[in-house]
Every structure is written in C-alpha cells, then in structure tokens.
C-alpha cells in the first residue's frame, strides 16, 4: 500500500491519532493535513538564466572542437544563445525574428566544422559556432515563410538544398549559400503550407 501511494503519502504535512475513553467505550480519531504544494529539489547539474523565457525548444549542437554537446536556444526577445555543457552562455545574438521550427547542424565549409542553419519568417540564418553569421547571411527570403525549412543533401556531399514555402504559396529552393537554386522553378501550392516539406 505504501509503495502504490507514494505520491499521495508524500503530500502529508501532519498526521495525528487520538484514543479517547468514554462510558466504557474507546473513541478513535485520525487527522491528516496535506500540503497544498510540494517543492522538489532541482535535480539539474546547472541552470542558466536567459534575458526572458525560452521561445523555442532547445537544440543540441555538437562542438566540433571538443565533441561536447552544447545547447542552442532562443528567448522571447528573439535573442539566440549558445550554452556550453557547464551552463555558461558562450554567446548571445539578436536575430530580430522568431526561429520558425527546426534548427539544423550543417558543415557549410565541408571541413568538419559545424554551423547552425534555421529560418525565421523573413530570413534564412546561418551562424557559426562563435555566433557570427556566415558570409552572405542572413538571406532575405523571396516571400515570408509559412513553414519550417526542410534541408536536403541528396548526394551526401554537403551540397545542401533548403526548401521553404512562402506566404505567396510558392515553394522556393535555396542552395547552401542562400541563393535560389539554378534551374528550380518555384511552384504554387493549392493552399498555404504550414508543415515541413519532406
């Protein structure tokens, strides 16, 4: 019984039991008081404060120098942060717009060093591990995006293609440098695309 009711029993703040004899009888009374709120100790190894609340779920980014996992996140003021494995903020970059969906870890220079690729409503962003934009980025999108970017590497040679749907209901394809793919003919969709293209 104790094991099955561990959560409920953990909420007990005080308990009392009383036996009272009266007129050849013994009366029992049990009084239990429960806590309104239980505060649990934090089991985290570290905590880091952002300027405000997180706006997106964290993305885990591999440090190509140390192999350690770092955390990329954006707050409600549209600042992007890279946080190391000890919880220290390595950098903070104002983006000017909310990240739309997924963040990709890519090898833009094809040298084993990674960058962060993502899109906002109006721009395609590519940041290096130090929080600097890769040349030519941010890239203004042809039409404000309505969905997260989709990343493709057809030949596994890091010649990336990025597909994004626009507010104009057209599907656009960009290459790794942010240019529209030569030979790609944007096509119109029947309705607005809000999910990632696959």
Where are these regions (language model features)?
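Extracytoplasmic/lumenal domain signature
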Residues: 8-13, 20, 25-198
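Charge-dense polyanion-binding interfaces
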Residues: 4
